[in-house]
Design a protein with these regions (language model features):
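Short internal beta-strands
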Residues: 31, 46-50, 135
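Short phosphate-binding loop-to-helix
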Residues: 47, 53-103, 111-119
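N-terminal nucleotide-binding beta1-loop-alpha1 segment
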Residues: 1-17
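Conserved core of the sugar-phosphate nucleotidyltransferase
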Residues: 80-83, 101, 110-200
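Hydrophobic helical membrane-anchoring modules
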Residues: 184, 198-220
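A short, N-terminal amphipathic alpha-helix
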Residues: 29-44, 57-58
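Short active-site oxyanion
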Residues: 42-47, 131, 203-204
Length: 220
């Protein structure tokens, strides 16, 4: 089984320019994800997809990284991560190997736990056929897509269950999905088919999209 750690790093960010190469505790956000991926013994390859010239220069000679330059049509504010993954994996599989499992590690989540990821991966491996596991935390934003948990699976909060006691939101720390799942649902999430891992630590739930988020991470 070939397991890929996938790190997407677009050059231009509307709300926080050049965020992927901004340094947190002396280390760029993308390098935080790269270093974490290297600690995962079950990962066979680390892929970076980017259109950022500085990131390309930084990793093009790395023996640990499979670097893929992202085309312009997949490097806009409207580009979906799943489209980037699909496009990149086609190139990867032609050149290297087939893919069974994708672990998405976004540079915007610099704080991660190896223990938690191993737990999530073990749960993922016990699932059958089409499967995915993603990280969530208690919801504090009614504007985001909110979920509740039923029979261990995530379900989207709708009009009929808005008053559900425990509501969660995807926090972006990690996503795990097999390639069949991604090809079929075009997402790491599908109702009644995705297992959530609840992160209680505040730092693990930090997702850097704005200057305020970055300042919060610096204080952590």
């Amino acid at each position: 089984m070939n397991t890929i750690a996938f790190i997407p790093a677009r050059a231009n960010s509307k709300r926080l320019p050049k965020k992927n190469i901004k340094k947190l505790n002396g280390v760029s956000l993308i390098e935080h994800s790269v270093r974490f991926a290297k600690t995962l013994k079950f990962v066979d390859d680390i892929i970076i997809s980017t259109d950022d010239k500085k990131i390309i220069k930084l990793y093009k000679k790395s023996k640990f990284i499979k670097l893929f330059k992202r085309p312009k049509h997949l490097a806009t504010n409207k580009s979906e991560t799943i489209s980037v993954i699909t496009h990149t994996l086609k190139k990867y599989e032609k050149k290297f190997d087939t893919t069974d499992t994708v672990i998405l590690l976004q540079p915007t989540s610099p704080f991660r736990s190896n223990k938690v990821l191993r737990l999530a991966y073990n749960i993922y491996n016990k699932l059958k056929k089409t499967k995915s596991v993603i990280s969530v935390s208690k919801s504090n934003n009614s504007l985001k897509r909110n979920f509740y948990i039923k029979n261990k699976y995530l379900e989207l909060v709708g009009k009929k269950n808005k008053k559900h006691k425990n509501i969660y939101q995807v926090n972006g720390n990690f996503y795990i999905g097999n390639k069949n799942f991604l090809d079929k649902y075009k997402s790491f999430y599908y109702t009644k088919k995705t297992i959530p891992i609840i992160l209680k630590s505040g730092s693990l739930s930090i997702d850097i999209d704005t200057k305020e988020d970055f300042d919060k991470a610096r204080r952590t």
